[in-house]
Amino acid sequence: GLVKYYKKVTKKISLIEPSKNLNSILKKKFKKDKIKVFKNKLVIKRKYETILYMDVIEHIQDYKNEIYLNLKNLKKGGFLVINVPAFNFLYTDFDKNVGHLKRFTKKDFFNLSKKFHLNIKKLEYYDSIGFFLILCSKLKNVSKNIKIWNYLIPLSKVFDNLFFNKIGKSLICVLEKKK
């Protein structure tokens, strides 16, 4: 998904995947595209225009330090794009089972932007239907059916607009490194 999109707009892409299994899968998948896949931090001495954390930092205990270290590799005026699960009160056994340490709110990103002197370019919740489904499943202890998301995501985009992106099961943040 995202890699295909970014291949159209940039010539150099590097991926980081600390999981040994997923790392080797990504290396095989992107070998012919000449996309480099690293196990840990950005290790090359190159400045990036954009760094993406797509459903990553919720797995990292010291996520602020992780971001701080990688901001050194971001060009001035570059973008840090972070996608995370939203609202700690929605934390479920599913989150725990997949290794999520927390869920985030806009306040987390306001604090992050102040701490690292970043401009917030976009900060909004999305997947409002997912928000209500998780909330209902928590309140009624209903088992989750993952297949239902495939049908509801397009509908959720309509509801996100109706709710002005004030609620959602996920949060996207685009931060700009000051020039």
Protein language model features and the residues they cover:
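Conserved SAM-binding loop
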Residues: 1-92, 110, 173-177
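A structural motif corresponding to the C-terminal end of an alpha-helix
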Residues: 115-118, 177
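Short, hinge-like loop/turn segments at secondary-structure boundaries
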Residues: 31-34, 98-101, 138-142
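Acceptor-substrate binding/catalytic loop of class I
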Residues: 93-112, 125-126
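A C-terminal cap/extension of S-adenosyl-L-methionine-dependent methyltransferases
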Residues: 125-179
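Hydrophobic anchor at the start of a short beta-strand
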Residues: 13, 120-121
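Short aromatic-enriched loop/helix-cap "lid" or pocket-rim segments at secondary-structure transitions
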Residues: 26, 92-96, 132-137
